[in-house]
């Protein structure tokens, strides 16, 4: 996702500096920093696109580089409580925090994928990302509100994807895969393309999505809502992250 945003922002005329501790390719026109702190220094806007588990550590590593002129946008799938905690840390620097939720696979929508944002930095994030073609809903609430909406959506989408995958694998084992696919497609407005997307994307992004679903289950539990299906989806995603194959 970071690569996608960096490419789009560079193409839109913005000066982009990025950091990735892994071997990810550096998009053309993007300056690659040696550290997150270096990448953030002097930036007008910071986009954090890591796994949710490291979001607090990332924030702590760059606090010294933030200024009151900086918008710090966290686009991870951390829980609402974590987003509020991150906002409090960022607030100590005078920077404006934005809790930003990505609604859909960026492999399909790219930088134009729909977003929800909340917090003091939300209007600026909405302005910049809308210029990239995204539809951005800037909520009036505090940080954590956007992530809460995404996790509520995930309580539908991630279990749905897992159930679809399970049904297709079962149909395959029974020699009736095409029939099962037709049954699923007839019930979903996305049709056959959505089924294929579930089958490929669920395995490809299993590790990251398992963290998101864990956060979703925790959020539902905090609301006093039973979350057996969400928890079961987490177990499925963790299995797929290890095995890398359906069935």
Task: Identify the residue ranges that each predicted region occupies.
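NAD(P)+-binding Rossmann beta1-loop-alpha1 motif at the extreme N-terminus of oxidoreductases
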Residues: 1-42, 65, 69
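A generic structural signal for well-ordered alpha-helical segments
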Residues: 9, 25-27, 90, 129, ...
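Hydrophobic beta-strand scaffold residues
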Residues: 16, 32, 96-98, 136, ...
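Rossmann-fold NAD(P) dinucleotide-binding segment
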Residues: 36-97
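Rossmann-fold dinucleotide-binding core
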Residues: 55, 78, 82-157
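Helical "substrate-binding/catalytic lid" subdomain
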Residues: 148-246
